[in-house]
A protein has these predicted regions:
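Ligand-binding clefts/hinges and TM-proximal coupling segments of bilobed small-molecule sensing domains
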Residues: 61, 139-154, 226-265
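Extended ligand-binding regions for polar small-molecule ligands
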Residues: 45-57, 117-118, 125, 130-131, ...
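Extracytoplasmic small-molecule ligand-binding "clamshell" domains
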Residues: 18-97, 134, 156, 221, ...
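Short beta-strand-to-loop elements that line the ligand-binding cleft
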Residues: 61-68, 151-166, 198
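Short helices/loops that flank or line small-molecule/ion binding pockets
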Residues: 70-82, 126, 160-181, 188
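Acidic, polar ligand-binding/catalytic clefts
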Residues: 64-126, 136-140, 198-200
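Periplasmic-binding protein-like
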Residues: 28-30, 106-111, 187-226, 245-261
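Ligand-binding cleft/hinge of the Venus flytrap
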Residues: 51-60, 102-103, 124-128, 136-158, ...
């Protein structure tokens, strides 16, 4: 009888462990089309849909932890969360801990944009002394030397959507945006109101990384992400939100193909 009870307990514990949620971290500065946060909880968006589909295909419930951006990496290191998506290794040169990275899932250019209805190509180094709309805490390697010499000044907003709103309101002549956010923002504007790219600042491949822990089905997660990418599911999710293929960018206008840190995320 005692052996039978012990066996039942082990089965019960195994069942609970099997249903432990897959914990994703989401920076609270993310906005659409990445994620829409409602009362601190994600409800829709490209990355929300991808993460939810990943957990479903892995066979685990998804659990989302919305944290200030400054706490995201610490949460990974402390084992509070298991997966971080929309990241690149070059953003985390001081990364400590044991992680395994997925294949690249998205390619995301950072753009210098303007409200000018007839934009011309711009070399940032030729810009006169002025403020550039940027996201608080984000790094822009191509522009940093110009910030360091005070040729340009950062005009920080808390998230990418606010940067675009300020540009639309005429607070700045130029701002920095990722391609997704620009495409999403322009969807609600009339053609003569839309914001336009004048140069590609940098372009970065981004993916997910997983905490390498025996409690986390790391290889199952990585294999599932490969399937989702190769099947076209991830690209189709992007198209669902930004409407067709992202606007083409002129590679000849790229000032530097140097990876940035958290571009537009």
């Amino acid at each position: 009888m005692r052996l039978a009870l012990g066996a039942l307990l082990l089965i019960s514990l195994d069942s609970v462990a099997a249903q432990a949620p897959l914990r994703f971290v989401i920076p609270d500065s993310w906005t659409m089309p990445m994620v829409h946060l409602e009362q601190g909880k994600p409800t829709q968006g490209i990355l929300y849909d991808v993460m939810l589909s990943l957990a479903t295909q892995v066979g685990l419930p998804a659990e989302f932890h919305v944290l200030p951006r400054a706490r995201v990496q610490n949460a990974m290191e402390q084992g509070e969360v298991d997966v971080r998506c929309y990241a690149a290794q070059s953003w985390l040169p001081q990364q400590s801990g044991d992680y395994i990275w997925s294949i690249p899932l998205f390619t995301q250019p950072d753009l210098l944009i303007t409200q000018n209805a007839r934009p011309t190509a711009v070399n940032p180094a030729d810009l006169s002394h002025q403020s550039i709309g940027t996201v608080l805490g984000y790094s822009y390697p191509t522009l940093q030397p110009l910030f360091d010499t005070d040729q340009l000044h950062r005009d920080d907003a808390r998230n990418q959507e606010l940067v675009l709103e300020k540009l639309l309101a005429g607070r700045n002549r130029y701002a920095v945006s990722n391609q997704w956010s620009l495409d999403w923002f322009n969807q609600r504007l009339l053609p003569d109101q839309q914001l336009h790219s004048v140069v590609v600042l940098q372009e970065q491949n981004v993916g997910c990384y997983v905490r390498n822990d025996p409690q986390v089905p790391v290889q199952r997660i990585l294999r599932t992400l490969v399937r989702m990418k190769m099947s076209g599911e991830i690209d189709e999710t992007v198209r669902l939100y930004i409407g067709g293929e992202p606007a083409a960018v002129d590679k000849s206008e790229t000032t530097k193909n140097r990876p940035g840190q958290d571009p537009g995320s």
